[in-house]
Amino acid sequence: IQPLSLYSTTKVNSENFILNTKNSSFEPCILRFATAHGLSPRMRFDLLLQEFLRDAILDKKIRIYGPNFWRPLAHVDDISNACITTIKSSKNLISGQVYNVGNTSENYTKKMLAEIIQEFVPSTEIEITGSKTDLRTYKVSFDKIKSNLKFISKKTIRNSIQDILSKIEKGNLDPRASEFSNMSKLTERVKAF
């Protein structure tokens, strides 16, 4: 692993610290989640798939920085099920282990994601722009969790796109509401302080 940001460096350092504290009464297991997607009680429209879908619906345009940058994605239901699977697994399969949570077939380039969304929202224009400072690109293997814990993610980005579009079309979800963006909520709290 080669962390590219302070955030990822902190995560790796934390994982190493936790794993190094393993003993007979503490047997940690690290789960590394792919980028979450899908409907959830606390929706996030500041995550890649939902952000692209929101922009397609409201702006009729998806702007892509780094179109060939890869991202792994996982449905929130699969992430939850991976946690349950891990908790129920025998300690010899999880103690001191690190598992990536997702499905290898759910690695996409940003351009691939935009094109799939365009299938659902055909009026969407895709605009490729110069890269921002975020240069992260990574494809992830999820073979270890599949092999060791027999865990397989079941839901795809297409499932999420259909579910989210349905909820928005019914008027039950406003993708621009600040409650669906961590940065917007943080900004509101700072201003209130």
Predicted regions and their residues:
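Oxidoreductase cofactor-interface core, primarily capturing Rossmann-like NAD(P)-dependent enzymes
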Residues: 26-31, 38-63, 73-74
